[in-house]
Amino acid sequence: MSVSEIFVELQGFLAAEQDIREEIRKVVQSLEQTAREILTLLQGVHQGAGFQDIPKRCLKAREHFGTVKTHLTSLKTKFPAEQYYRFHEHWRFVLQRLVFLAAFVVYLESETLVTREAVTEILGIEPDREKGFHLDVEDYLSGVLILASELSRLSVNSVTAGDYSRPLHISTFINELDSGFRLLNLKNDSLRKRYDGLKYDVKKVEEVVYDLSIRGFNKETAAACVEK
């Protein structure tokens, strides 16, 4: 085989991979659009009237996750399953965003932390890498940290809306998250930096709870602060 033939063959490989990446990008763009629609829907809970609409908004968000499943099913067909991490960078950020959105829905519904397995059911993907297109542990953790930031914001807006007990519940939840993350030995630089922001979320919520307690808005809040 001549030198030119070798490079022609290599160009064929490069072109084929570029085609794969282009197909992946198209699906990821659709995922990003659906994620924006879900986020817009859930952002309504930060508004005064949005608190009464939480069940309705969560139900509607779950309907949108049906579209997410369809897009992810399509994405799985665009590349060989064993090459997941070769193309992972294309969908990593939108998948983390979808984890956050799924976690936010579950929290609004039950004030609990969604498990990684439950997220994979919502998204229609696998929990284990051996089974193909899956939810990487670090992507799950990143999504959970985005949730913490969103909840710290919700604690402030809850007070504005006159819901004085919600910040206490959020404070308990975020402190439990912080305790959980302290058990992990995080090696991923991006994840570790994002975790550094969790302490600010914890502090922000604690300040809201403390402010409520000294102003006497909520007996439950005040009692909890006295116990501390």
Swiss-Prot record:
Please name the source species.
Bos taurus (Bovine)
Q: Encoded by which gene?
A: TSN
Please give the GO cellular component terms listed in this UniProt entry: cytoplasm; endoplasmic reticulum; endoribonuclease complex; nucleoplasm; nucleus
Q: Which Pfam families match?
A: Translin
The text of the family note is: Belongs to the translin family.
Main subcellular localisation: cytoplasm
Name recorded for this polypeptide = Translin
GO annotation (BP), single? siRNA processing
Q: Disulfide connectivity?
A: none
Q: Report the InterPro entries cross-referenced here.
A: Translin, Translin_C, Translin_fam, Translin_N, Translin_sf
Cite the entry's keywords alphabetically: Acetylation, Cytoplasm, DNA-binding, Endonuclease, Hydrolase, Nuclease, Nucleus, Phosphoprotein, RNA-binding
Molecular function GO labels:
endonuclease activity; identical protein binding; RNA binding; sequence-specific DNA binding; single-stranded DNA binding
> Where in the cell does this protein reside?
Cytoplasm; Nucleus
